């Protein structure tokens, strides 16, 4: 069945971005059916010119599911921090430069190379999750490359969203070119 031939199974029979079904539930007392913005409490918000939110992401070449196939990710994974050209120019950072990242919430530091790209908005950074920054003490020599980059979870506070319990994977850091 397609919605064109039969109505959706929502209370209105139409596509709903948020279901008004929630409004009629006893547990929905004092809950607005419409989404609203609430600033996150999972991390400190950037204030200085060299402070950024890192949005972490995944793809088929860099996620926890491919850790079983570690060696191929040496060639397909990206262990760099992506930065918008506007921010890079302002901070004097060029493609391939190494930066030090320091957590705003946790006293953690790491280093990574920078990819300057328009694929990330100004004022934020991007890093693939699970793609680098391994800190295991003993590694086979052919796997030393897994130490490259950072693991964004180093900087995460571990705070979860009260409504649904999901953890924040985005973090805030202070950066400097090294």
Task: Set out the residue ranges of the language-model regions.
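Long, low-complexity segments enriched in small/aliphatic residues
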Residues: 1-71
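Long, contiguous, secondary-structure-rich segments that constitute the structural scaffold
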Residues: 66-82, 86-178
């Amino acid at each position: 069945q397609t919605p064109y031939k039969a109505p959706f199974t929502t209370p209105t029979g139409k596509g709903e971005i948020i279901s008004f079904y929630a409004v009629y539930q006893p547990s929905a007392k004092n809950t607005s059916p419409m989404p609203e913005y609430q600033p996150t409490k999972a991390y400190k918000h950037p204030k200085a010119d060299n402070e950024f939110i890192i949005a972490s992401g995944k793809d088929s070449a860099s996620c926890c599911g491919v850790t079983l196939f570690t060696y191929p990710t040496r060639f397909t994974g990206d262990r760099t921090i992506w930065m918008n050209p506007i921010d890079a120019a302002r901070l004097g950072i060029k493609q391939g430069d190494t930066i030090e990242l320091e957590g705003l919430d946790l006293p953690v530091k790491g280093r990574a190379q920078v990819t300057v790209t328009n694929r990330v908005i100004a004022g934020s950074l991007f890093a693939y999750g699970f793609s680098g920054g391994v800190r295991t003490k003993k590694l086979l020599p052919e796997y030393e490359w897994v130490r490259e980059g950072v693991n964004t979870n180093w900087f995460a506070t571990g705070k979860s969203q009260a409504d649904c319990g999901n953890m924040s994977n985005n973090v805030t850091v202070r950066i400097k070119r090294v």
